[in-house]
Amino acid sequence: MIEHFNGIIYLIIFVIHFLIYAVYAYRCIVTTKYFLDKYGVDHSAAIMTRFFGSMFLGSIIMAIYIIFIRPMIHGDIGLENPWAFFNLIFLQNLSAFIVAFYSIKISKLGINDKTSIDGVIVPGILTLLSAILCYGLADKM
């Protein structure tokens, strides 16, 4: 498995990236009330928050498929052909970062005392991690 990721570093980055996704999926889908209360959002936004979390969940399921299930079904083919998935993840992270930056620094719509800079920092970290994955795995995809 390690050789398919061009070494342990890229495998660790992959795992960290999707663990962060798992945390946010859990917080949005399972502990929705706590998540909404933390950011001062009305509980009527629960459905949209869970919708947001479901996007993370779908990506996690695909990542699990790529790393564990796909090799069992198709043999030891490594990371051949999942480039679209990794690029989509990068573009989603980049979009989240840009929109969050715009929302907090430029638009300021809905900014209050419970507004957290987490909305910019986490997508920024995820964008960096996914960019590193796209670069480091480019020859494998």
Residue map of PLM features:
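Juxtamembrane helix-loop boundaries in multi-pass membrane proteins
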Residues: V41-F56, P82-I89, N112-L126
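Hydrophobic alpha-helical membrane segments
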Residues: F85-I104, P123-S130
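Juxtamembrane boundary at the C-terminal end of a transmembrane helix
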Residues: S130-M141
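Cytosolic, membrane-interface loops and tails of multi-pass inner-membrane proteins
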Residues: C28-A45
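Membrane-helix boundary connector in multi-pass membrane proteins
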Residues: I98-G119, D139-K140
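Hydrophobic transmembrane alpha-helical segments in integral membrane proteins
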Residues: M1-Y21
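Core segments of alpha-helical transmembrane spans in multipass integral membrane proteins
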Residues: L19-A25, A46-P71, L91-L94
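Membrane-water interface of transmembrane alpha-helices
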Residues: I20-K33, F97-I104
